[in-house]
Curated annotation (Swiss-Prot):
The keyword Metal-binding does not apply. It is found in: Late endosome membrane; Cytoplasm. This is Charged multivesicular body protein 2a. The gene is CHMP2A. Belongs to the SNF7 family. The keyword Ribonucleoprotein does not apply. Its main location: membrane. A motif (MIT-interacting motif) lies at residues 208-218. GO terms for cellular component: ESCRT III complex; late endosome membrane; multivesicular body; nuclear envelope.
Length: 220
């Protein structure tokens, strides 16, 4: 039985075979339990029927059968639980075996990579990469400086002149608008002198009124 097509079965194949056998056993136990449960229901119906007819001897015999049937049902439930526990253990073994095989493969791959990984060569490659990258940066900087020297001055002068012209134009418009909103100089001075004269006259009237009241008080 350990040979499959002239060769020995692997542990994985043996585990799968035993797993299938346990699954079939659990199905058989479930079917037998269901038959016993159906028989239990039938016995209960017969007991009630005989009890109504007054046949107590038959009732006692069927009651014993009912007790035995219920015990068998419990035994089948226990047996199925045990078989299921064994099936779970086999499944755990399969999982552990799969994990071990995977770890074995990973270990081999890591060993191969470590053998192929030569640190001096990698270090040399990185140093050469940094060197070439530095040379490329220097060349790019020199090219940018040359382009700026050749094209940047004229463009900068033209752009700066345009900005200055725009700013001066905006300032000129703003100053013109503000000057237009100011009142004429003569009108402002005349209005100020008129308000000062009115204030002086009001003060003089108040002083005269106060002086008149003091005179009246002295007469009284």
């Amino acid at each position: 039985m350990d040979l499959l097509f002239g060769r020995r079965k692997t542990p994985e194949e043996l585990l799968r075979q035993n797993q299938r056998a346990l699954t079939r056993a659990m199905r058989e136990l479930d079917r037998e339990r269901q038959k016993l449960e159906a028989q239990e229901k039938k016995i209960i119906i017969d007991i009630k029927k005989m009890a109504k007819q007054g046949q107590m001897d038959a009732v006692k015999i069927m009651a014993k059968d009912l007790v035995r049937t219920r015990r068998y049902v419990k035994k089948f439930i226990t047996m199925r639980a045990n078989v299921q526990a064994v099936s779970l253990k086999i499944q755990t073994l399969k999982s552990n075996n799969s994990m071990a095989l995977a770890m074995k493969g990973v270990t081999k791959a890591m060993a191969t990579m470590n053998r192929q990984l030569k640190l001096p060569q990698i270090q040399k490659i990185m140093m050469e990469f940094e060197k070439q990258a530095g040379i490329m940066d220097m060349k790019e900087e020199l090219m940018n400086d040359a382009i700026d020297d050749a094209m940047g001055d004229e463009d900068d002068e033209e752009e700066s002149d345009a900005v200055v012209s725009q700013v001066l134009d905006e300032l000129g418009l703003n100053l013109t608008d503000e000057l237009a909103t100011l009142p004429p100089p003569g009108g402002s001075l005349a209005a100020g002198e008129g308000r000062a004269a009115e204030a002086a006259a009001a003060l003089a009237d108040a002083d005269a009124d106060l002086e008149e009241r003091l005179k009246n008080l002295r007469r009284d």
